[in-house]
Amino acid sequence: MDNVIGLEIIEVVEQAAIASALWMGKGEKDTADAVAVDAMRNRMNQIHMRGRIVIGEGERDDAPMLYIGEQVGICTQENAAEFCTLDELIEIDIAVDPCEGTNLVAYGQNGSMAVLAISEKGGLFAAPDFYMKKLAAPPAAKGKVDIRKSATENLQIIAECLDRSISELVVVVMKRARHDGLIKEIREAGARVRLIEDGDVSAALSCAFSGTNIHALMGIGAAPEGVISAAAMRALGGHFQGQLIYDPEIVQTGLIGESKESNLARLKEMGIDDPDRIYEAEELACGETVLFAACGITPGTLMKGARFFPGGVRTESLIISTQSKTVRFVDTIHKLDDKHRALQLH
């Protein structure tokens, strides 16, 4: 899988990032997301693969494209056996977020990117559109920190693993009212807090790289993005744990469902019998081979955003593989035609 479609999935996230970046700073988050979805889907359908969206833009009735269960790739056609190899006919699961951080793009803020993860069929946890309590930490702290422990305890462990003082640590937390207590505890423990509006996949990913000045991600965010983060962290050897949140009172928003009871019933219908289970990265992304790809839309910790110039655009992407055990950063110059359709320069 790595050798067959590795380069092509980079192009998938590049196309999504370029399309979305054209709307950076225009205050139209829905449009920035819609064009990214369209570009990502179009490029996916040019790949010789038999893909199935397991994490996407929502349920079929709510999302016209890249909905959960949608089949993508040339080899999903009825006569695919005539022009696809046996390897290409193997089913793969795909988790996507064509524009992670739509508000960031709309308001010209840092940290937005186009992301996807792929694995063989059954290799990615089909997370419901719920929230998830998350803990991400550097590889040195893998298996030592634990989401069941307090933030203070985990900060002490991370500091010891990195041979640093707690006062040197920076923890990323999403700026939400539900995190007021967590933020207070982190600061009282002596660490620093970097608040973000959106985009916790980028924050989780940054924990696994030295020199980013991000040492942990804590708090509650979207569950689908948790699976994508887990895929990246598994490939990077970093620590990631997640626990589904089904109680609207904890999240303090009405976006999770009408009630705790209805959410529990929905989880049971999905086959999730233990709603309080703590998931490790290896459970959320359990496939033998997992690939993660991302491309910066706006400037971020690991990648610069899309930069336009007369006649073209330059992007920075990365691809991470559990198969080859590599992290590749890709700096690409694209030539743009009159319709702003990106074509890679050779």
Curated annotation (Swiss-Prot):
The lineage of its organism: Bacteria, Bacillati, Cyanobacteriota, Cyanophyceae, Acaryochloridales. Mn(2+) 1 binds at D33, E57. Keywords: Calvin cycle, Carbohydrate metabolism, Hydrolase, Manganese, Metal-binding. This is D-fructose 1,6-bisphosphatase class 2/sedoheptulose 1,7-bisphosphatase 1. Homotetramer. Its cofactor is Mn(2+). Catalyzes the hydrolysis of fructose 1,6-bisphosphate (Fru 1,6-P2) and sedoheptulose 1,7-bisphosphate (Sed 1,7-P2) to fructose 6-phosphate and sedoheptulose 7-phosphate, respectively. Mn(2+) 2 binds at D97, E100, E225. GO terms for cellular component: cytosol. NCBIfam families: glpX (TIGR00330). InterPro entries: FBPase_class-2/SBPase. Pathway: Carbohydrate biosynthesis; Calvin cycle. Pfam families: FBPase_glpX. SUPFAM superfamilies: Carbohydrate phosphatase (SSF56655). It is an enzyme of class 3 (hydrolase).
